C-alpha cells in the first residue's frame, strides 16, 4: 500500500557517502561510494538511489504524484505523525557515531581503512603443534579411560588412518588441578600449568578431516586444499602492518623445524596480494634470511632501487595496478628495508640473563633452547608491530612422528609426547609470562592448536590414531577470559558433545579480537567473495572478556 510518510536521508544531508573498499574479479581494489548510514522512517517500501537519497518508493514517483493531491496534511499533523521517526533518526545517528568512533584507523596498505569495532588485540601468535596432540593426555582428562584400560571400545569406532585399532588406552600421564581456577593439566606441561589461569581451554574443537596435509590446510586456511590464503595472510591483508620495515606475517623456524605436511603453501597468500604471504625467518641462524646482509653500501642500493623504480612504476600503471606486479614491487622494497632491521631483531645479546633462563635458551636441551628462541623472537616481533607470527615445532622422530608432524605418535606415545612437550612447555609458558610482565599480553592473542586430536583407544600397543571428532585447543591474552574451560567431549574423549566448535569459529573469534568482523573481511576472486571463515563461523563470545 502507498504511504505518504517517508523521510529520505541523502548524500548531502547529515549522513554522507563514505568510500568503501571492494574488489573486482581480477583482485584489483577500487573505491566505491555507498551510504555510510541508512537511517529512515517510513510506512512504505524504501529504495536506495545510488549515493543519493533513500526514499519512499512512491512519494517521489512523478507518475503517481496525482495521488498526493487527494490527501492534504497540515504541518502540525505531519510533525505529530513523524515525531517518532525523527527521534529514531537522531538516536540511530548518535549510536552510529559512537560505534564508528570506537573503530581504530589502520596503517596505509591495509585493505580496511578502519577496524570494524574497537580491537582487543593487535597481534596474534599461533603456536602450531604439528602432528596432532592427544587431548586426553594434555588438557582433557578422562578417568573412564584409566578405569577401563584394555577393554574394548563400547561405541562404534570411526574409520581411522590405519585401522590398526586396539582397546581403550588410559593416559600414561597424571593430571593435577592447577592455578586458582583448578583446571587439570597433564604432567606433560608443568610450566604451562603455572599459567593456566591465563588460558581459555576449548575442549570441543572439531575438524572434518583426519589426514595431516588436508587437516593442516583446513586449520590454516579454512579449506582442505592448497591455493587459499592462510589466517596470517588474511590478518596482514585486512589490518596491514604497524612496521613497514617488516612483513605483516612472519613464520619462525629453528633447529630441525620444517613446514608441516602441506609445505610452505600453508603460509600462502593464496589469491590475496603477494606481500601478505608468510615470510620464514630462521630464528637460530646467523642469517635469519639467506643473504640478508648486503654486500654493497646502503647508498648504492638506494640508487639501484630508485633506478629500478623508474621502470616499475610506469609498468604498474600499464597493467592497471595489477596485484601481482604491485606485490612484487612491495616485496623487494620491504626486503631492502629488512636488511638493517632483521639482524637487529635476531640479536638477542641485549636480553637479560634472566630472560635467557626464562625461555630455556641456556638449557642443555638443544631443542628446547631452539624453540625458546622462536618464542623470544615472537615477543620481539610483537614489540616491533608485526601482525601475525607462527611458531614451528622441531623434528622428533618417535612413534611415526617425523619432520613435518613431530606430535604424530601412532606408537610410543608416552616417549614421543613427553619429548615434544619438553621442547615447547617452558618456552610457551615463558612467552605468556614475559608478555604479561611487559604489558603486552593484553593486546597479543596466543593460539595453541594442532590439526586434530588423538583417539581414546590405542593403535598398536602404545600409540593413538588421529581423532578429528573432538579435541582441545586454547587461547590466551588478547581479551580472552583466562582460567576457563569451554565445551566438552564425551566421557571417552571421542566426540565433542557440548558447545561443539569448528575451526571457522576459532578464526572468527581471533578476527573479532583484532577488531574485524569475519563476515566483512572478503576478497573477490573467481566470481565470488572469499573469506577466511568461508560461509561459516561464530564468535565464541563466552571465552571473551
Please describe what each predicted stretch is.
Residues 34, 38-74:
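N-terminal secretory signal peptides
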Residues 3, 11, 18-19, 29-33, ...:
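Short, low-complexity intrinsically disordered segments enriched in A/P/G/S/L with frequent Arg
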Residues 11, 15, 25, 30, ...:
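Intrinsic-disorder/low-complexity regions
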Residues 60-545:
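Ligand-binding pockets and gating/stacking loops
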Residues 16, 22, 30-36, 45, ...:
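Intrinsically disordered, low-complexity regions enriched for glutamine and histidine
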Residues 21-23, 28-31, 36-37, 43, ...:
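Composition-driven detection of intrinsically disordered, low-complexity segments
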Amino acid at each position: 500500500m502507498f504511504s505518504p510518510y517517508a523521510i529520505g536521508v541523502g548524500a548531502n544531508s547529515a549522513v554522507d557517502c563514505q568510500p568503501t573498499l571492494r574488489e573486482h574479479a581480477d583482485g584489483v581494489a577500487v573505491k566505491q561510494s555507498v551510504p555510510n548510514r541508512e537511517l529512515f522512517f517510513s510506512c512504505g517500501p524504501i529504495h536506495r538511489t545510488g549515493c543519493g537519497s533513500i526514499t519512499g518508493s512512491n512519494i517521489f514517483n512523478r507518475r503517481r504524484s496525482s495521488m498526493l493531491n487527494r490527501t492534504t496534511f497540515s504541518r502540525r499533523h505531519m510533525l505529530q505523525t513523524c515525531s517518532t521517526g525523527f527521534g529514531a533518526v537522531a538516536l540511530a545517528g548518535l549510536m552510529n557515531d559512537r560505534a564508528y568512533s570506537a573503530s581504530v584507523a589502520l596503517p596505509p596498505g591495509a585493505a580496511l581503512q578502519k577496524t570494524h569495532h574497537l580491537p582487543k588485540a593487535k597481534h596474534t601468535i599461533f603456536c602450531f603443534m604439528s602432528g596432532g596432540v592427544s587431548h586426553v593426555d594434555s588438557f582433557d582428562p578422562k578417568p573412564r579411560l584409566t578405569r577401563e584400560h584394555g577393554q574394548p571400545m563400547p561405541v562404534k569406532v570411526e574409520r581411522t588412518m590405519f585401522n590398526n585399532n586396539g582397546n581403550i588406552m588410559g593416559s600414561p600421564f597424571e593430571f593435577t588441578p592447577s592455578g586458582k581456577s583448578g583446571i587439570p593439566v597433564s604432567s606433560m606441561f608443568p610450566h604451562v600449568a603455572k599459567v593456566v589461569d591465563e588460558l581459555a581451554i576449548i575442549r570441543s574443537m572439531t575438524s572434518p578431516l583426519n589426514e595431516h596435509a588436508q587437516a593442516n590446510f583446513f586449520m590454516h586456511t579454512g579449506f582442505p586444499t592448497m591455493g587459499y590464503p592462510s589466517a596470517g595472510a588474511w590478518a596482514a591483508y585486512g589490518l596491514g602492518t604497524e612496521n613497514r620495515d617488516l612483513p605483516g606475517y612472519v613464520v619462525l623456524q629453528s633447529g630441525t623445524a620444517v613446514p608441516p605436511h602441506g609445505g610452505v603453501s600453508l603460509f600462502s597468500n593464496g589469491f590475496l596480494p603477494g606481500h601478505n604471504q608468510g615470510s620464514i625467518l630462521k630464528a637460530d641462524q646467523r642469517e635469519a634470511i639467506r643473504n640478508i646482509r648486503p654486500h654493497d653500501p646502503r647508498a648504492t642500493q638506494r640508487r639501484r632501487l630508485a633506478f629500478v623504480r623508474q621502470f616499475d612504476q610506469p609498468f604498474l600503471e600499464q597493467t592497471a595496478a595489477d596485484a601481482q606486479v604491485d606485490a612484487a614491487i612491495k616485496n623487494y622494497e620491504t626486503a631492502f628495508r629488512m636488511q638493517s632491521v632483521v639482524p637487529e631483531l635476531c640479536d638477542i645479546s641485549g636480553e637479560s640473563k634472566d630472560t635467557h633462563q626464562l625461555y630455556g635458551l641456556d638449557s642443555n636441551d638443544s631443542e628446547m633452547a631452539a624453540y625458546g628462541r622462536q618464542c623470544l623472537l615472537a615477543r620481539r616481533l610483537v614489540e616491533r608491530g608485526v601482525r601475525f607470527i607462527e611458531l614451528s615445532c622441531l623434528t622428533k622422530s618417535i612413534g611415526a612422528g617425523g619432520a613435518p608432524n613431530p606430535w604424530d605418535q601412532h606408537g610410543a606415545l608416552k616417549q614421543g609426547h613427553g619429548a615434544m612437550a619438553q621442547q615447547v612447555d617452558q618456552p610457551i609458558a615463558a612467552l605468556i609470562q614475559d608478555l604479561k610482565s611487559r604489558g603486552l599480553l593484553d593486546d597479543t592473542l596466543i593460539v595453541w592448536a594442532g590439526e586434530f586430536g588423538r583417539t581414546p583407544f590405542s593403535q598398536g600397543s602404545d600409540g593413538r590414531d588421529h581423532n578429528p571428532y573432538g579435541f582441545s585447543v586454547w587461547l590466551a591474552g588478547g581479551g580472552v577470559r583466562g582460567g576457563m574451560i569451554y565445551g566438552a567431549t564425551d566421557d571417552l574423549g571421542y566426540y565433542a558433545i557440548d558447545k561443539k566448535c569448528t575451526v571457522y569459529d576459532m578464526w572468527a573469534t581471533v578476527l573479532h579480537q583484532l577488531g574485524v568482523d569475519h563476515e566483512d573481511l572478503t576478497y573477490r576472486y573467481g566470481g565470488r567473495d572469499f573469506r577466511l571463515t568461508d560461509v561459516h563461523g561464530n564468535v565464541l563470545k563466552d571465552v571473551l572478556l
